Amino acid sequence: MPDSPIRSDALKEYRKLYEEGGPFAQLASLFQVNLILDANVIIKELIWATTKRKNPLGRSDLLEVLEVETVVAWAPTFLEREVEKNFAVVVGKGARREDVVDHWVHLRALINFVDVGGVPADVKYRDPKDVPYILLQRRIEATIVTADKDVAAMDGKVVPLAVFATLRAYSRAAAVQVTLQVSGYTLGSLGLRALVQITRFASSGVKKAMTNVPREVWLAMLVQHPLNRLNK
């Protein structure tokens, strides 16, 4: 099946149309989820982008969902130090340091950083480096994306890195849908028919029920999506 000419970036362009108060707000909503990124997520991304990427314009699952704003990324300020401390590890994989720094600067601009303080000295933890992520989770109630088993062992709510593949698949499919929806609305009679169908759906009990489902439940459903299981 050929790739659609409609890129997932259309989501970012049209997202405001579907936000509360926007002209399409009553017709549908675009899924968006807050996720906390662990340092191992960023380090893996840096290694891929600087040593394995063949197409300079190619994007990883992570980068795409960040750029199209399907994922709103969060991290404790501690992550910055942890990532920069591991630049040498990435360079050791064959990357040029300047490429690592450039990609990190781009990624950092897509992450919301929160200072949650340091690790309490009077408490013992399985892995003290994971504490800032758990503290941030308690503050903003977002799931942590990590490959570190210690986070879950310390009662952190986690999801595997494979979730980004599922979220990218959603983003691409949703981009096609909203592009056709918006374009159809502006194309006269064809758009009017589509708009009527969407409006009927929006006013149905099904639509009302869907909008009441917490986003954490949607995330759990995405994690169980067949596309996600194929990437494990």
Residue ranges and their predicted role:
Residues P2-A73:
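Short, well-structured N-terminal submotif of metal-dependent ribonuclease cores
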Residues L37, A147-D148:
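Active-site flanking residues adjacent to catalytic metal/cofactor-binding acidic residues
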Residues V41-I42, L79, Y133, D150-V151:
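Alpha-helix capping/helix-boundary segments
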Residues E45-W48, V83-V89, D155-K157:
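A short acidic (Asp/Glu
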Residues E67-T70, T77-V119:
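PIN-domain endoribonuclease scaffold, especially VapC-family toxins
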Residues V72, A142-A147:
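Short hydrophobic alpha-helical runs that function as membrane-insertion/retention elements
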Residues I111-T143:
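Active-site neighborhoods of divalent-metal-dependent phosphate/nucleic-acid chemistry enzymes
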Residues D150-K232:
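Acidic, PIN/NYN-like endoribonuclease modules and their adjacent C-terminal/linker elements
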